[in-house]
């Protein structure tokens, strides 16, 4: 005879009306998403969350509520990407590690949002930047490689542990030659550097970013501009590193100066180099894998924190 699972009823006390509102989401959107993931019924009555369903599912649902507590407890709505990341951690048996994510607040954005890693691998990446002078991050688009590195740089700058933030990337990533593009130098390189400015604007705001650039505290420049320099007291971020050649990667890495850190980011599935050139990032991942003082972090589609469809799109193109 098939055993019938027992049903049950769980209650969780909520600390405030703001927390209750955040946990519900607009039009109960969060509760509905929660129900679709866990298979239990959720209702908020006053300052209590009530859950009904079979016991095993109730236990998982309760665990999922607790994993997202650091967000909704502060009266903040739980983004779908955070809910999905928590659910994924629960499925992989990593709930204890995921519970620490909410405590890892790196900074606050200009709008007051808490900036923090959203997945376990993102947390490991942030901790690598904190503990190593050279960190490589390899993973698909949307996994927060550049954004989190920039947030870490902002935090170090605020704590006066560095004096400068340098963001760079190859200026030619689609086979175009700058000499044949219209406009002056700034107009030519701006489209390639725009993603870096976007990260800065989301952290510092437009006006403060421009002010820090004017003061020379933040520098955003093509990779070629790094040649011949020694970068001291800085956090230097190389973005789109998969599109560097071996010689460019070597040039960049040897710019590391005293009391500085470097972060090298890239997606080795999106290499735009031509003429069968070897990617400097791919080669570096082979020759530095066992080098003491250098850390490699690998992010996956499960770490994508853009629109939920992005994960599905990346998976579909594999």
What annotation goes with each model-predicted range?
Residues 36-43:
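A short, structured beta-strand/loop element
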Residues 110-122, 128-238, 242-318:
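Conserved helicase motor core of SF1/SF2 NTP-dependent helicases
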Residues 87-118, 130:
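Proteins enriched for Cys/Gly/acidic motifs involved in redox and nucleic-acid/cofactor modification
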Residues 2-21:
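Short glycine-/aliphatic-rich beta-strand segments at the starts of folded cytosolic domains
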Residues 43-102:
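Interdomain "pre-motor" coupling segment immediately N-terminal to P-loop NTPase/helicase cores
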């Amino acid at each position: 005879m098939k055993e019938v699972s027992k049903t049950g009823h769980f209650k969780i006390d909520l600390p405030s009306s703001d927390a209750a509102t955040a946990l519900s989401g607009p039009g109960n959107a969060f509760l509905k998403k929660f129900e679709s993931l866990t298979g239990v019924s959720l209702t908020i009555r006053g300052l209590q969350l009530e859950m009904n369903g079979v016991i095993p599912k109730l236990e998982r649902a309760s665990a999922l509520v607790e994993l997202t507590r650091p967000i909704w407890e502060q009266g903040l709505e739980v983004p779908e990407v955070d809910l999905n990341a928590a659910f994924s951690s629960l499925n992989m048996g990593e709930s204890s590690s995921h519970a620490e994510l909410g405590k890892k607040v790196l900074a606050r954005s200009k709008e007051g949002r808490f900036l923090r890693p959203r997945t376990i691998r993102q947390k490991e990446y942030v901790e690598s930047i904190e503990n190593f002078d050279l960190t490589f991050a390899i993973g698909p688009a949307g996994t927060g490689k550049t954004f989190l590195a920039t947030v870490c740089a902002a935090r170090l700058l605020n704590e006066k542990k560095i004096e400068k933030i340098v963001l760079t990337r190859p200026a030619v990533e689609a086979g175009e030659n700058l000499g044949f593009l219209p406009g002056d130098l700034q107009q030519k390189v701006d489209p390639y550097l725009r993603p870096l400015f976007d990260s800065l604007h989301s952290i510092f705001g437009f006006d403060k970013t421009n002010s820090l650039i004017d003061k020379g505290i933040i520098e955003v420049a093509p990779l070629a501009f790094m040649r011949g320099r020694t970068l001291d007291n800085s956090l230097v971020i190389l973005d789109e590193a998969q599109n560097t050649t071996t010689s460019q990667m070597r040039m960049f890495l040897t710019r590391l100066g005293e009391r500085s850190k470097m972060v090298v980011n890239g997606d080795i599935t999106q290499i735009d180099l031509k003429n069968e050139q070897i990617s400097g990032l791919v080669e570096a991942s082979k020759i530095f894998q066992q080098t003491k003082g250098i850390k490699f972090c690998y992010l996956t589609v499960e770490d994508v924190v853009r629109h939920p469809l992005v994960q599905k799109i990346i998976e579909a193109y594999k």
